[in-house]
């Protein structure tokens, strides 16, 4: 089984821990919760991937916006064939700021206008951690405009190396940009701050109130991904993540909003491997 699909096994293995986090709220119906699978680490074709996640019971997938018409046709054909939803990931790796921003804008513009199946949302790897506030704000301004025009929710991911790489930095962005919406991958912050964030409770509470989408990976104080969340040594870490996610779920239920969750478990070598085996 590929690492992309192993997420399903890991999530099912967390049932015991989740049952201890009994909460007095639940979604009204299945359509209010969309569980998506990642193709990160999957080595087959798009069609093969869609077959696999459909079989595992996923509602859809999150993928990078396809860069060519051929890839777009391939993806949208598979989504239609297997009746799957989609969320798009947009971002840029260019070093030069102007080039980086331009590439990002082109992806956002394409993803909000050139689709055959309207995405549930767009998730952004926005800016860089070393760009200035004003430089990074340009990414927020563009996505705000694009979201308003298209009606597609656009979220900015809490991701290392990107604009929202740390909790306190994100707080500053939220205070200055109250309409900012987040994709919560809090595993990154556990790594960045080398903690389970107990010393930033008010900041985390503010961030959770802005979450539209979740990446459900479990990080820890020394890395962005535990080796196996079912292992007893990660019990406290798993519970911390479940509590953060439950806070988002409670908010979504209260507001009558749909929640999307991407199950994510990084492949080798993101997942550490034995020395001398690669």
What would you call each of these model-derived segments?
Residues 41-46, 60-74, 93-103, 128-135, ...:
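Acidic-and-aromatic substrate-binding clefts and catalytic sites of carbohydrate-active enzymes
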Residues 96-181:
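Active-site acidic/histidine proton-transfer and metal-coordination neighborhood
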Residues 1-20:
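N-terminal export signals
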Residues 92-106, 130-132, 139, 225-235, ...:
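Surface-exposed, active-site-proximal loop segments in enzymatic domains
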Residues 22-39, 46-68, 105-132:
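Long, low-complexity, intrinsically disordered polar/charged segments
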Residues 29-38, 61-63, 84-91, 120-124, ...:
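Hydrophobic faces of well-ordered beta-strands that scaffold small-molecule active sites
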Residues 22-29, 47, 52, 110, ...:
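Histidine-acidic metal/acid-base catalytic patches
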Residues 25-28, 50-55, 69-88, 103-118, ...:
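Acidic (Asp/Glu)-rich catalytic clusters
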């Amino acid at each position: 089984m590929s690492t992309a699909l192993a997420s399903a096994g890991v999530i099912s293995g967390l049932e015991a821990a989740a049952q201890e986090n009994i909460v007095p709220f639940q979604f009204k119906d299945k359509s209010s919760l969309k569980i998506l699978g990642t193709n990160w680490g999957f080595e087959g074709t798009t069609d093969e991937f869609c077959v696999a996640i459909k079989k595992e019971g996923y509602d859809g997938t999150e993928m990078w916006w396809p860069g060519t018409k051929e890839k777009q046709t391939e993806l949208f054909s598979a989504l239609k064939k297997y009746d799957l939803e989609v969320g798009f990931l947009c971002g840029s790796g260019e070093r030069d700021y102007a080039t980086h921003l331009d590439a990002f804008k082109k992806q956002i513009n394409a993803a909000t206008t050139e689709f055959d199946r309207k995405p549930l949302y767009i998730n952004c790897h926005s800016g860089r951690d070393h760009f200035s506030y004003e430089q990074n704000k340009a990414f927020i301004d563009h996505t705000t405009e694009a979201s308003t025009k298209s009606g597609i929710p656009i979220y900015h991911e809490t991701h290392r190396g990107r604009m929202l790489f740390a909790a306190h930095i994100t707080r500053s962005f939220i205070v200055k940009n109250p309409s900012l919406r987040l994709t919560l991958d809090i595993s990154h912050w556990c790594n960045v701050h080398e903690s389970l964030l107990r010393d930033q409770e008010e900041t985390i509470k503010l961030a959770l109130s802005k979450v539209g989408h979740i990446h459900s990976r479990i990080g820890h104080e020394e890395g962005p991904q535990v080796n196996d969340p079912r292992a007893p040594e990660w019990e406290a870490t798993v519970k911390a993540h479940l509590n953060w996610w439950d806070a988002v779920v409670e908010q979504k239920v209260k507001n009558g909003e749909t929640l999307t969750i991407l199950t994510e478990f990084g492949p080798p070598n993101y997942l550490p491997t034995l020395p001398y085996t690669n």
